[in-house]
Amino acid sequence: MILLEVNNRIIEETLALKFENAAAGNKPEAVEVTFADFDGVLYHISNPNGDKTKVMVSISLKFYKELQAHGADELLKRVYGSFLVNPESGYNVSLLYDLENLPASKDSIVHQAGMLKRNCFASVFEKYFQFQEEGKEGENRAVIHYRDDETMYVESKKDRVTVVFSTVFKDDDDVVIGKVFMQEFKEGRRASHTAPQVLFSHREPPLELKDTDAAVGDNIGYITFVLFPRHTNATARDNTINLIHTFRDYLHYHIKCSKAYIHTRMRAKTSDFLKVLNRARPDAEKKEMKTITRKTFSST
């Protein structure tokens, strides 16, 4: 299985090139790039007001207001410091870099810029991991509508944090492959007792979402992660956040890859069958033809 990159490579490569050229004393060039990411996220890299010595990185998330309710603004201030500026129009967060005043730790700064989406997501997880660490119970469940028709729920208890993703499968094939995929996670936990518990429910929401407006339907699935203190403590939580916030994309990416692989194998097998059939086909009988005088000749 393939782990999706947590960082955004386009941001990192663009900023790294800009920093490298600036450090070499090269004349700055204009940049204007707009590109998308998973979960309807949109990025914009540009020169604000046409100033080529400044590079702005902006991100738009449809669900950012829900993240703000869980401390997203405070977390971003802590991570990005003075690079965080007022967001440009149409975006939720903007970072500004001055090519005439390069930071000392350029590699670290570039990497953190590439982690912008992850860091926006991180606030809700850090908040509930902290609740669990402090033994708080009864806090309201976090509800993040991270896609138009899909939702993430986060809830903390004294001994665990429960994260539930709802997801929509486009067709019956996706449901079948998704079930097989989730079964592999259950098998994986048997091999590693330190892995979190992973549960999958189809059509109906899990008990954790009882008496909520969670969606119900033949194409609806729910993936539940039960995270224990070994997954949420201060040393492990960053890696946990890195992995869990991309899980929905990871699942659907592998469903698409599986369907493409099956389709490729079917085409290859069909081609092999056709070759066998062509070899087994009998040669056409040669028809003997004669002239009016009964002499034989062959047609060409």
UniProtKB/Swiss-Prot annotation:
Gene3D superfamilies noted in UniProt: 3.30.1460.20
Keyword Cytoplasm: yes
Major place of residence: cytoplasm
Alphabetical list of SUPFAM superfamilies matching this protein: Arp2/3 complex subunits
InterPro entries named among the record's database cross-references: ARPC2, ARPC2/4
GO MF terms, alphabetically ordered: actin filament binding; AP-1 adaptor complex binding; Arp2/3 complex binding; ATPase binding; glutamate receptor binding; kinesin binding; protein-containing complex binding; structural constituent of cytoskeleton
Keyword terms: Acetylation, Actin-binding, Cell projection, Cytoplasm, Cytoskeleton, Nucleus, Synapse, Synaptosome
GO CC annotation, single: presynapse
Residues where N6-acetyllysine is found: K275, K295
Subcellular location: Cytoplasm, Cytoskeleton; Cell projection; Synapse, Synaptosome; Nucleus
Subunit structure, as described in the record: Component of the Arp2/3 complex composed of ACTR2/ARP2, ACTR3/ARP3, ARPC1B/p41-ARC, ARPC2/p34-ARC, ARPC3/p21-ARC, ARPC4/p20-ARC and ARPC5/p16-ARC. Interacts with SHANK3; the interaction probably mediates the association of SHANK3 with the Arp2/3 complex.
Function, as annotated: Actin-binding component of the Arp2/3 complex, a multiprotein complex that mediates actin polymerization upon stimulation by nucleation-promoting factor (NPF). The Arp2/3 complex mediates the formation of branched actin networks in the cytoplasm, providing the force for cell motility. Seems to contact the mother actin filament. In addition to its role in the cytoplasmic cytoskeleton, the Arp2/3 complex also promotes actin polymerization in the nucleus, thereby regulating gene transcription and repair of damaged DNA.
Family per record: Belongs to the ARPC2 family.
Protein name from the UniProt record: Actin-related protein 2/3 complex subunit 2
Native species: Rattus norvegicus
